[in-house]
């Protein structure tokens, strides 16, 4: 334990918290342009073709973003909105595309959990 005199001379250092989503620069979402849309395979116990896209953001960062939901309409030069949130079984994917905003369509025929996939309420 430090004495009061030692703390007066040299105060305690604050721990600096490192951001999980540095490319957002403390913003809730960021806009960007798709530079490449492709599929990748997940890490060891899982098996699938996960849809991801490489996005050049308005602040100059280039990040990999996951496209959630069944089916999508994204291609190169599509303008997308990305949010934070990593995909545990895809290394290097720390962002999600926001469905139903800008050029990204919502998931069609979605009945439950619609707000997460940008789907309007069915009539």
Curated annotation (Swiss-Prot):
Residues 113-123 have a biased composition (Basic residues). The modification 3-methylthioaspartic acid is found at residue 89. One of its GO terms (cellular component) is small ribosomal subunit. Keywords: Methylation, Ribonucleoprotein, Ribosomal protein, RNA-binding, rRNA-binding, tRNA-binding. GO terms for molecular function: rRNA binding; structural constituent of ribosome; tRNA binding. Gene3D superfamilies: Nucleic acid-binding proteins. GO terms for biological process: translation. Belongs to the universal ribosomal protein uS12 family. Part of the 30S ribosomal subunit. Contacts proteins S8 and S17. May interact with IF1 in the 30S initiation complex. HAMAP family: Ribosomal_uS12_B. This is Small ribosomal subunit protein uS12. It comes from Saccharophagus degradans (strain 2-40 / ATCC 43961 / DSM 17024).
């Amino acid at each position: 334990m430090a004495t009061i005199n030692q703390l007066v001379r040299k105060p305690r250092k604050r721990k600096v918290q490192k951001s999980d989503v540095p490319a957002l620069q403390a913003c809730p979402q960021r806009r960007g342009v798709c530079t490449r849309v492709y599929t990748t395979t997940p890490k060891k116990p899982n098996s699938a073709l996960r849809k991801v896209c490489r996005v050049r953001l308005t602040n100059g960062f280039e990040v990999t973003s996951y496209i959630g939901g069944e089916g999508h309409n994204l291609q190169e030069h599509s303008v997308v909105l990305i949010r934070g949130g990593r995909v545990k079984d895809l290394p290097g994917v720390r962002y999600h595309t926001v469905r139903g905003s800008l050029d990204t369509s919502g998931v069609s025929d979605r009945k439950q959990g619609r707000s997460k996939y940008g789907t309007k309420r069915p009539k």
